[in-house]
């Protein structure tokens, strides 16, 4: 996906392929299983992957918000995941690695299978705390300025945030 606007109002799997590349655009999807899924296709012999370099993506899924049977890489854009409330799935689910080297990630979901990015070139904040549906979640710097703000449409217990605006050695508060 290189640009444009995609709005998937209901589906089993929002976007699914052996390789999912998002280089721009505005994507909003609602899935009753996985939101974005890179699945194994033994016919191709290639490792499944999800690559995000730009764009604004919102994945609201009852299953895994982002699910790769291989790798995930994010170098730009904004990815907001409203993942499962069931502990059988996670907001982020990957088998090999999740390289976070740019962009902004907000991943909210259940705690049971919670994963955060595995390789980071920017700070990541992981919080495990119950938050009710309809709550506004804000991450603020030491000066009280919002760095990240979102409203969760469903209950969550795992909150994962990463952005280049997080500075190493700085203090942040979550409200």
Name the predicted role of every residue range.
Residues 1-175:
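A composition-driven surface/loop motif
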